[in-house]
Amino acid sequence: MLIANPIYDTVFKRLMENKRIARFFVETLIGEKIEDIAMMPHDYTYHAKVSKNERKKETVEDSKQEWEILSIIRFDFVATIRTTDGNSKKVIIEIQKSSKPTDLMRFRTYLAEQYKRRDVVEVASGKVEKALPIICIYLLGFKLTNIQSAAIKVCRNYIDMVSQTEIKQKNEWIDALTHDGYFVQIPHITGKPRTSLEKLLSVFEQKYFFDEKNTLKDYEYPIDDDNLKMMVEMLKHAASDAKTRREMEEAWWADENEKEQERLEKELKETAKAIEEKDKTIEESRKSLVEKDKTIEEKDRTIEEKDKEIEELKRQLKK
């Protein structure tokens, strides 16, 4: 089956805007039952500048004619989770997707924004402001150092520091100041899927592409889940949609242009550093020559003084 590559922001955004797919995606990743999920009024994107008129730039100056393409995409949801003890709790689900490890500080900035939020929730006595717990999901288009797992969960444990035992009870105040994190390393997604999580991740596997831009791929794994089927069908439709394919191609060129600009900037820095090193070597050579000239002058003066002494001795001997 021909489907659109969901790592492209325009495609992933379409998936997350579908409530059923978003619920299935989050529920499968965090491994908890979600009773309800709603996207918050905005999604945040970081925009990278790319050339509007040229596919490839010869110099960094060429990047002055630009347009904007998404570099980071972020979605925020409010979800009601059914806990293992049968109770319900509201949480904020933050999903961030990026292809570069250099986006770490942006991730931290977005997280700080969430901690500053004041959410209004319904309670028995009416509406109240409340700091909801946060769950972060990061989709990474790069590999983390020394970790080969495709999906990683970093969770909080309450530990009694005196007895060194785990505390099973949870506290809303503590939960509001800490959060669980889920990390998906897209480059490590590979192999035949077996579990529900692996089947979901298999959609993001970066293999079996039809073109060099990696916009379209062949998905041939068995589908035995209605939600997964709906997700794949949406990707199939996106693959045949001219507007979506054009947006994916533009994003691919944006990425290529950004890589080229980074290469040129790196090349310019290396050239500047090499020139600086050469200038330093030339300056050191100049100083060395000056020192040698001084040494020669001193030797000449010494010889001149000795010659004078010899002449004086000769005059004295003639007397």
Can you name each region flagged by the protein language model?
Residues D9, K19-R23, M105, I134, ...:
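Non-catalytic, well-ordered alpha-helical scaffold segments
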Residues F12-E17, P187-G191, D218-P222, D226:
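Generic amphipathic alpha-helical segments used as scaffolds and interaction surfaces in large
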Residues V26, I137, V184, M231, ...:
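A residue-level signal for conserved active-site and pocket-lining positions in enzyme catalytic cores
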Residues M1-H179:
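Accessory alpha/beta interaction modules
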Residues Q148-A150, P193-E198, E247:
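Short conserved micro-motifs at the rims of enzyme active sites and ligand-binding pockets
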Residues S163-Q164, K168-F210:
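Extended serine/threonine-enriched, polar tracts that run as long, contiguous segments within proteins
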Residues L2-P6, T84, V91-Q96, S202-K319:
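Short, charged alpha-helical interaction segments and adjacent helix-coil junctions
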Residues S125-V128, P187, L235-K236:
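Selected N-terminal structured segments and early membrane-anchoring regions
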